[in-house]
């Protein structure tokens, strides 16, 4: 099963992107794309590890930290959660990027191109469709249009998962 990374840092799409990613068992970036998020994966993994360490410290009953230090750790954790919260479970770079507004997320597009990761993108009239492997011409600003596209994409992902899990497995051998 391919792993998708849904990317949209527009406020109006943040919740939609998070919901579809969680519903389909994939990942998302809905706050800010950090430069090098996939091209410099080892550094990002270290940041995820730091986030997990902060959570362990804050959840621990035995603490050797002062209230001030715990407050600082809490602030750092919140900041890291905003940017990395949707990729904490990601173990390696994704198989496919699904990008809403390829103009705004141009750094994500360039990183995916550099690594040869296929891109599915909602491409508005102000975007270059030549940069995207699978462009979807649509309004990338409207919440309803993005919701419609993602709902249909979710159905496709769900039906693909159901087909792979059901049956006697002979379909895959053809």
List where the protein language model places each region:
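Membrane topogenic/interface segments and analogous intrinsically disordered interaction regions
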Residues: 1-3, 7-9, 15, 89-93
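Intrinsically disordered, compositionally biased charged tails
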Residues: 155-174
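Long, charge-dense
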Residues: 20-73
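Nucleotide-binding motor/catalytic cores of P-loop/tubulin-like NTPases across gene-expression machines
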Residues: 104-136
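Residue-level signature of catalytic and energy-coupling elements of molecular machines
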Residues: 6, 97, 149
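Phosphate-interacting basic helix/loop segments used at nucleotide- and nucleic-acid interfaces
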Residues: 79-84
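Structured adenosyl-cofactor binding patch, chiefly the S-adenosyl-L-methionine
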Residues: 129-161
């Amino acid at each position: 099963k391919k792993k998708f990374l849904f990317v949209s840092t527009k406020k109006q799409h943040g919740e939609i992107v998070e919901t579809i990613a969680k519903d389909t068992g994939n990942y998302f970036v809905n706050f800010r794309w950090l430069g090098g998020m996939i091209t410099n994966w080892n550094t990002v993994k270290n940041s995820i590890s730091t986030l997990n360490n902060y959570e362990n410290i804050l959840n621990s009953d035995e603490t050797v930290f002062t209230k001030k230090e715990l407050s600082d750790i809490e602030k750092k954790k919140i900041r890291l959660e905003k940017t990395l919260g949707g990729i904490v479970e990601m173990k390696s770079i994704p198989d496919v990027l699904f990008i809403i507004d390829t103009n705004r997320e141009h750094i994500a597009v360039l990183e995916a191109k550099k690594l040869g990761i296929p891109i599915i993108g909602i491409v508005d009239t102000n975007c270059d469709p030549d940069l995207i492997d699978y462009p979807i011409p649509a309004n990338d600003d409207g919440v309803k249009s993005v919701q419609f596209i993602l709902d249909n994409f979710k159905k496709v992902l769900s039906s693909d998962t159901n087909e792979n899990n059901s049956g006697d497995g002979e379909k895959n051998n053809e």
